[in-house]
Amino acid sequence: MKVGVVGTGFVGSTAAFALVLRGSCSELVLVDRDEDRAQAEAEDIAHAAPVSHGTRVWHGGHSELADAQVVILTAGANQKPGESRLDLLEKNADIFRELVPQITRAAPDAVLLVTSNPVDLLTDLATQLAPGQPVIGSGTVLDSARFRHLMAQHAGVDGTHAHGYVLGEHGDSEVLAWSSAMVAGMPVADFMQAQNLPWNEQVRAKIDEGTRNAAASIIEGKRATYYGIGAALARITEAVLRDRRAVLTVSAPTPEYGVSLSLPRVVGRQGVLSTLHPKLTGDEQQKLEQSAGVLRGFKQQLGL
């Protein structure tokens, strides 16, 4: 099983490292316009293979992506202080218009996994640039993991026993679906009551804020986030490579909302196999529609 990573900055190289540590694939090629960086990252990560899963790791040009089952796109500019989201979108859209056709020529059968930001809009653009090829965005997989982590932390349980989805935009307008959140198979409110733990609007607001502002808090302390998203990308990639039929909140074109956004989706060998629509409260549904509206506004401004 072969995976390509295009873009070897913090996110791309950390995703590659996670793939090797988890034994997600047998072959891994790193591609970057900065060939020296790609070579150095590939060599460094390859040194982890003998003490993990023996993955073959190397660097190369776009032609080396041939026969990859998944290509992860992390290439793009980072948002600078004072730069608007539209400015960032226009800059990264130009990068994608140059990059995606090269990738599709080299790996026409690969599932394209987009994680460059703004991920929902670039997922839409990549879908247009690679007609007929499966495209998914990392969406709110990381946001959902943050949500579950904070819920589990408050509940005092292992994070794998907390379940909840973050829907809509990967960004400011994202929606925490509290109505379907569960801990240990119980509705979250019931679990907290059974454990005599506080559960009120103040607690929910703290978890919401912690989920929504996690990236900003981490960036303030260390200038970038990459471990969480690197692990999330490895998880999504495995779902495709091994046809796991995993339910993940990836971003994909959603006709009823007119834009790519995150909903729970079944992910397998061909990318998104089906989309699930959890039952939401009226308030959650309204917020999801507002989130879609925010994305449509940016999409129209860019002319996508």
Curated annotation (Swiss-Prot):
One of its GO terms (biological process) is pyruvate metabolic process. GO terms for molecular function: L-lactate dehydrogenase activity. This is L-lactate dehydrogenase. InterPro entries: L-lactate/malate_DH, L-lactate_DH, L-lactate_DH_AS, Lactate/malate_DH_C, Lactate/malate_DH_N, Lactate_DH/Glyco_Ohase_4_C, NAD(P)-bd_dom_sf. Pathway: Fermentation; pyruvate fermentation to lactate; (S)-lactate from pyruvate: step 1/1. The gene is ldh. Catalyzes the conversion of lactate to pyruvate. It holds the Pfam family Ldh_1_C. NAD(+) binds at V11, D32, R37, G76, A77, S138.
